[in-house]
Curated annotation (Swiss-Prot):
Residues 104-204 form the FAD-binding FR-type domain. Binds 1 [2Fe-2S] cluster per subunit. Residues 3-97 form the 2Fe-2S ferredoxin-type domain. Its EC number is 1.18.1.3. Pfam families: FAD_binding_6, Fer2, NAD_binding_1. It comes from Pseudomonas putida. Belongs to the bacterial ring-hydroxylating dioxygenase ferredoxin reductase family. This is Toluate 1,2-dioxygenase electron transfer component.
């Protein structure tokens, strides 16, 4: 039996390792050409110390206190030369990917679907046999090369990978390089290059209630996360607040409704900032955060949106006098 171990490097690159039962993560990594920091291999030096974000694993008792203290082990630190995965895991590696003789993976795919969801948003799906090998954590992104140019644009996955196909939500920008291609030139079958996955914004192990805050096409990583949660189930409540500027920016509402039907503890709301909106809930995301959703601080908050939204939410939470258990955020600025 094998388990997937995601290695999240400090430069944002993520690579996946297949670890066999009883095999140390370090041995599995080196077997697959990923040279994690390592020295003694005996649990004596601490050179391979990483942080386990999630997953079940064993460390054995053969390492020494100087290499990994009891307090560090309780916090989630591991020695990869001793760590044996007992489920899929995620570890943070305190080194850049190039130092570990690896880099972001590259793929070729073809457009399988492209459609304009509204005057401001485009849905893009790409597919290829090689994408069956693409593994990523829900919430991460890739760099897509704009066909016919040497320019790339970063987009979060809006779906999980299924049968070699992945999807994205893309904001349409007047005169934008990718926007112009997708609206005027793109057709099914066109070739697309991508590299990744990248990013430290991804779904962690769910240990408490979640509050998900999306701004505009910042909804994309959350639909991928919700797809994963729908697959694996969970007992903790989660609420999504989706904020946009104009009515036409509201997209994928049918998908959110479908998730609400599939995930027992999931609820969502949406709001539109424009005072001219016909949508029932007007205003900003912070106006629709309820005290019960903050759960006295026993909550993990995920936020993806433009920088002003991230700052506004941060200020709001501070004003409530609450320190959430975890606050993960991804700022994005649309690129032309």
């Amino acid at each position: 039996m094998t388990h997937k171990v995601a290695t999240d490097f400090e430069d944002g690159v993520t690579r996946f390792i297949d670890a066999n039962t009883g095999e140390t993560v370090a041995d599995a990594a080196y077997r697959q050409g990923i040279n994690l920091p390592l020295d003694c291999r005996d649990g004596a030096c601490g050179a391979c110390k990483c942080f386990a974000e999630s997953g079940r694993y064993s460390l054995g008792e053969e390492y020494i206190e100087d290499a990994l203290s009891e307090a560090e082990a309780e916090q989630g630190y591991v020695l990869t030369c001793q760590m044996r995965a007992e489920s899929d895991c995620v570890i943070r590696v305190p080194a850049a990917s190039d130092v570990c003789k690896t880099q972001q993976a590259g793929y070729q795919a073809a457009i399988s679907n492209v459609r304009q969801l509204s005057e401001s948003t485009i849905a893009l799906s790409i597919k290829s046999a090689s994408l069956n090998q693409l593994a990523f954590l829900p919430g991460q992104y890739v760099n897509l090369q704009v066909p016919g140019s040497d320019q790339t644009r970063a987009y979060s996955f809006s779906s999980l990978q299924k049968d070699g196909e992945v999807s994205f939500l893309i904001r349409k920008l007047p005169g934008g390089l990718m926007s112009s291609f997708l609206t005027s030139l793109a057709k099914v079958g066109d070739s697309v290059s991508l590299a990744g996955p990248l990013g430290a914004f991804y779904l962690r192990e769910i240990k408490r209630p979640l509050l998900l805050l999306a701004g505009g096409t910042g909804l994309a990583p959350f639909t991928a996360m919700l797809e994963k949660i729908a697959e694996q189930g969970g007992e903790h409540p989660l609420h999504l607040i989706y904020g946009v500027t104009h009515d036409h920016d509201l997209v994928e509402m049918d998908k959110l409704e479908a998730f609400a039907a599939r995930i027992p503890n999931f609820s969502y709301s949406a709001c539109v900032a424009s005072p001219d909106s016909a949508y029932p809930q007007k205003g900003y995301v912070t106006q629709y955060i309820e005290p019960k959703q903050l759960n006295g601080g026993e909550v993990d908050i995920y936020l993806c949106g433009p920088p002003p939204m991230v700052e506004a939410v941060s200020q709001y939470i501070r004003a409530q006098g609450i320190q959430p258990a975890n606050f993960y955020y991804e700022k994005f600025a649309a690129s032309a």
